[in-house]
Amino acid sequence: MMKYNNLFWAFSVLSLLGCSSSQEVKTIPDSLSGIYPKLAYYNNEGECGTGAVVPWADRLWVITYGPHLPEGSSDKLYEITPDLKQIVRPESLGGTPANRMIHKESGQLFIGPYAIDSLGNVRSIPYNIMPGRHTGNARHLTDPSDKIYYGTMEEGLYEVDVRTLAVREIYEDANFTKREKSSKEYGPIGAMLPGVHGKGLYSGQGVLVFTNNGEGSNEALSKFDIEAGVLAEWDGKDWKVVRRNQFVEVTGPGGIYGNTNPETDPVWATGWDYKSVILGVRDAKKGWTFFRLPKSSHSYDGAHGWNTEWPRIRNVGTEAHPDYLMTMHGMFWKFPADFTADSSAGIRPRSAYLKVIGDFTRWNDRLVFGCDDSALKGFLNARKAKANFPGPGQSNSNLWFTSLTKPDELGPATATGSVWDKDPVKAGEYSEPFLFSGWDYRMAWVKNDSSHSVSFAFEVDKKGNNQWTPLREIKVEAGESVHILFDKEELGEWIRVKTDAPTLATVSFTYTDSDERSTTSDEIFEGLAELDCNHSIGGLLYSLGNNRRALGIVSTQQKDGKVVECGYYEMNDTLKLVRKDDPESRDFIVEKCAIPSKVVTVESSSVLVVDDKGRRWRLPLGDEAYTGLMDQNALRICREVVTERDLFSCMGTFYELPAENADGYAKIRPVATHNYKINDYASYRGMMILTGVDPEEGKKNPHIIVSEDGKAAVWAGAIDDLWELGKPVGHGGPWNDTQVASN
């Protein structure tokens, strides 16, 4: 068990007279960084994600979901008016829905188990009639004017009459199928298809396409690099496995309406394996063709498939001027509306993000992202760096409103991916095409794990028209590796590689852009206490449960080198910090949310981190002042602030840290470096909350919220504001005057 240093709280018995008590009251805005606290939604389940977000009937319609609830739940259907009033619809049935489709012929939006007409009237299909975790809708193969398909995460398939809502079961949902379960399996596993955890459903070219992104084995709960998931299609009679990888989105240029010309329009599917993102496109004559893209974040990995939510490709332009936005592995992508196997040019990285996004849309000339922010149940995301830290008291999430250009304005588009990773390769065998255009700097790492030398020949498709030309060829000796730096003149939409001899090969690509960020934090962070501040207001944070829907804060102040407790405060959707007399909540936060000690070891060369498997990792050093603060347990180091991944704070740098089942520290991603004394951080109503504030410095900053008595203060914004803290910087290495043995 990790030891806790109680010195931080020993000063709570000191006189509260040491806390400041004067504060000029300022107006608190309705929203911060595009997040409206009043629009947050809660449920009584282990998770409260956003399943779908759709503009319809002059309203924005939103459904939420809890984890694995095929017969309904406390989740709701929300109707949001143009002036941002949230209406909880009485027809709500809950469940785990993420489906949405607009059926033009009947003038209805199908979202979750609901059908909504053009006037906003809602009809529900009860779960006892159509059970399962509704994951997708699709146009009917033979009667698209009168019927639609509903698909569930466990291979249930239903045909629904759009006018009467009569339901015909085609395939039973596996949650309700009696079958003997193996001790090596977890959860309900369908008998028709490999893989579990269904995600996408779409129809076109005479088939219904279904995806899932997980594997139903105990092995999948801890490993990220085993076979998992499926891309499959159904012709109305039989199922066919197209590819055995983890797939999520399946759609086409028709998007939420279905393809306009279903016989010929392409069908797109996104997925991944442990090597890279996979993009599939179906042609009516050629069938499926696959491409690969790099990953910006690895926090979506995991063979169980739980870490992804619902990645999407959606038109966020207009009907006259389509503009497709793709979310995949922590990156916003520009996706061409006319993408096919023979016209594949135009996919481009936009920027990296930290939010977990379940769906998104354009509404009233803004983008609206439905997020999965704070889950009561930590699922598999446990690690000793957090000790036994509790999840939020109640699951909650929110919408994130942004400008239309925000997907171009967040983190740098650094990305990595492989076409081969210690894979057996035959002589003359081509890799799948890998995206080659869209970054300032591109490199490849090539490894030959055979007993003989091998030549690797790279080719490019310059225009995305499936016409390939030689780029360069390199010879790699047995057991050796080579780095390749590509020049800016080496152009192409896609790159592929082949060898002249059989080998065990690795070919991995790393792409980066020039990071134009300053090392100075943006003005939205004014009022966070800098390292040399000796009068900052800190505090421990916890999102309360029992439907209180408030944030609890045990406020502290640093004064004359001592930490003094200033009282217990709460904040609700008005963003006012109010002092409360609630010793039970205060005691819970002090005991359960204390900052653990010895999470990392600061050495002369770098910061040593030992993960839960005993693997040793090193991170760069920052300002020396952080060493003392970390030793005093004055800085939170690790916490989950978006579902199923952690935010890691070390030596003044924030990192995105994947769950251990997604390879953890091996795939850590630096976000930003700052010069602030951030005491604690948490998610609440979709916002990122920080403590460690200098109220006087932040008195003009709307992101700094201070109680009327001046004894409690927080910074509030969005997690993706963190990119603006400053470019990641650091120094150090694995050794510093270290005695090293050979090998």
Predicted segments with their positions:
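Surface-exposed loop/turn elements that mediate protein-protein interactions on large endomembrane-trafficking
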Residues: 29-34, 74-92, 113-133, 157-184, ...
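Beta-strand-rich domains and repeat architectures in extracellular enzymes and scaffolds
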Residues: 39-75, 94-101, 433-435, 440-442, ...
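Repeated scaffold domains used in trafficking and secretory/extracellular systems
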Residues: 45-52, 92-106, 129-145, 174-205, ...
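Entry beta-strands of beta-propeller and related beta-repeat scaffolds
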Residues: 59-62, 106-110, 144-149, 203-211, ...
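Short, conserved, GDST-rich strand-edge loop motifs in beta-rich repeat architectures
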Residues: 65-75, 210-229, 267-268, 276-281, ...
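Residue-level signature of beta-propeller blades and closely related beta-rich strand-turn architectures
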Residues: 66-68, 114-115, 153-154, 212-216, ...
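Blade-level signature of beta-propeller repeat domains, shared across WD40, Kelch, NHL, RCC1
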Residues: 358-421, 679-742
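Noncatalytic modules at the cell exterior or secretory-pathway interfaces
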Residues: 488-505
